[in-house]
Amino acid sequence: MTRGEDVEAPKVIFGRLLNDLCTAMTEDKGEPEENLDGFLQYFVRLVNRSGLEIGITLNVSGLTISGQLISSKSYFEGLIQEMSSANTDNQVKLAFQEAFRKIGGIYSQMDDEDNENQTFPTYIHLRNAKMLLASGQIIRTKRGVLWRGRLSEVDGFCLGAMD
């Protein structure tokens, strides 16, 4: 394999994955689910549309996750920033950043069209997330992380983030 093929491989792979992901995302109608907290879903929708950031603590299958509730757009912008400091080949960084930019653009477009289509979010995004196991053990990170989870998996929540 030549150097040119090495550089092109990540672009081709990410291009295919991005196409598959974009197709799957546009097929998701984001309709309300029965086992979902409608208030939390509405609150996430409000954050996605307004860009508001607010502290929140979630209970997810025995795990407590706490951080700043952010819009899907802010989440993907954060992923792009994280990739800029990744310890990997520059072409791979650029491919990831472009993929995150395109995916984030799709979410932004969905949020903008939300007024007309009344779509409902199916994912929740946190910045500076910290996790606490049911045993009380904190999952240690050097700093909080970006976190994404399915709204249908959230058992409960409260406004405000843990210190």
Predicted features along the sequence, with ranges:
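Conserved RNA-binding domains used in RNP assembly and mRNA/RNA metabolism
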Residues: 2-163
